[in-house]
């Protein structure tokens, strides 16, 4: 299913790669509609630990060469606050840029892997 996420914007700002598309596997009522305040609380810690997040990226160069990588990490509900704390820690230590920047722009390619339990595999 094609979706429009912030990753599409930040991906271009971080890499300069045009024509980025994002597809997500969705099952059941993963994207409910209506009054979102009526949604149940997020997953429990046990549920988050049982369901890790995975994403695949494929890039095709102008010469037709294809590069693929997979990131596997903790559940998104866990990853987001861990990454925010890591980013804040690094900013407080002086690692920052003025104006708009993505995490990859500011902290470099290895930022995602600084989050414990995260592994990126290149194919």
Language-model region placement:
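C-terminal catalytic/substrate-binding lobe primarily of soluble NAD(P)-dependent oxidoreductases
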Residues: 1-123
């Amino acid at each position: 299913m094609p979706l429009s996420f912030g990753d599409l914007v930040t991906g271009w700002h971080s890499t300069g790669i045009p024509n980025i598309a994002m597809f997500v596997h969705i099952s059941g009522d993963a994207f409910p509609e209506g009054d979102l305040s009526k949604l149940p609380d997020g997953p429990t810690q046990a549920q988050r630990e049982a369901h890790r997040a995975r994403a695949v990226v494929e890039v095709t160069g102008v010469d037709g060469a294809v590069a693929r990588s997979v990131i596997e990490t903790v559940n998104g509900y866990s990853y987001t606050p861990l990454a925010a704390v890591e980013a804040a820690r690094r900013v407080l230590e002086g690692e920052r840029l003025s104006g708009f920047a993505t995490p990859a722009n500011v902290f470099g390619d290895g930022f995602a892997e600084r989050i414990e339990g995260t592994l990126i595999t290149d194919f």
